[in-house]
């Protein structure tokens, strides 16, 4: 009887997981530090802003964990931010990694932070290659954001360079996202 209950619970958990879509590697799983503080982020946001970290690229989970820890250390220790700046990050391994996560305001696009989620690709996409699994992960994450009510269904997608004087998100990402359905020029 206990095994049947356990099996039923496992099926329900898996069904819930599948309904939410893309798997997000938690901050604890990649060895991130807890935030010093958080600011709540509203629901049904109007914007998603795409970035690149302009740093090291990673191809494996272990490499991505190390890069994430480095980005977080730079943001917290050098810039004095309470946490890594982005809500989510995507590695060359195709995984989505938790940054500030859902419902916490990021520090990725100045005055746009209260109205947007920030998604960053690990690497410098002026020369690093954007792989199909990374594109798929980003699109699934955006769909999840709409399904969970974090983004409005009519959200607008911008590259960071559209809201700030920067090369971010790099030429390769810039060329890719301009073909996505929610992108606005």
Curated annotation (Swiss-Prot):
Its EC number is 3.5.1.28. Residues 46-170 form the N-acetylmuramoyl-L-alanine amidase domain. It catalyses: Hydrolyzes the link between N-acetylmuramoyl residues and L-amino acid residues in certain cell-wall glycopeptides. One of its GO terms (biological process) is innate immune response. Residues 1-21 form the signal peptide. Zn(2+) binds at residues 51, 160, 168. It is found in: Secreted. SMART domains: Ami_2, PGRP. It is an enzyme of class 3 (hydrolase). It holds the Pfam family Amidase_2. N-acetylmuramyl-L-alanine amidase involved in innate immunity by degrading bacterial peptidoglycans (PGN). Plays a scavenger role by digesting biologically active PGN into biologically inactive fragments. Has no direct bacteriolytic activity. This is Peptidoglycan-recognition protein SC1a/b. It comes from Drosophila simulans (Fruit fly). The lineage of its organism: Eukaryota, Metazoa, Ecdysozoa, Arthropoda, Hexapoda.
């Amino acid at each position: 009887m206990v095994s049947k209950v356990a099996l039923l619970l496992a099926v329900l958990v898996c069904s819930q997981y599948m309904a939410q879509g893309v798997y997000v590697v938690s901050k604890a799983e990649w060895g991130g530090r807890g935030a010093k503080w958080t600011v709540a982020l509203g629901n049904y946001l109007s914007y998603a802003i795409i970035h690149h970290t302009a740093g090291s690229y990673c191809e494996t989970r272990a490499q991505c964990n190390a890069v994430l820890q480095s980005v977080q250390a730079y943001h917290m220790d050098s810039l004095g931010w309470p946490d890594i700046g982005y809500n989510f990050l995507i590695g060359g391994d195709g995984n989505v990694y938790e940054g500030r996560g859902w419902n916490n305001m990021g520090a990725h696009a100045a005055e746009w932070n209260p109205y947007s989620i920030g998604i960053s690709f690990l690497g410098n996409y002026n020369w690093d290659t954007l792989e199909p699994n990374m594109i798929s992960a980003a699109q699934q994450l955006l769909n999840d954001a709409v399904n969970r009510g974090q983004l409005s269904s009519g959200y607008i997608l911008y590259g960071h360079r559209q809201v700030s004087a920067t090369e971010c998100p790099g030429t390769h990402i810039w060329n890719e996202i301009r073909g996505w359905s929610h992108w606005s020029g």
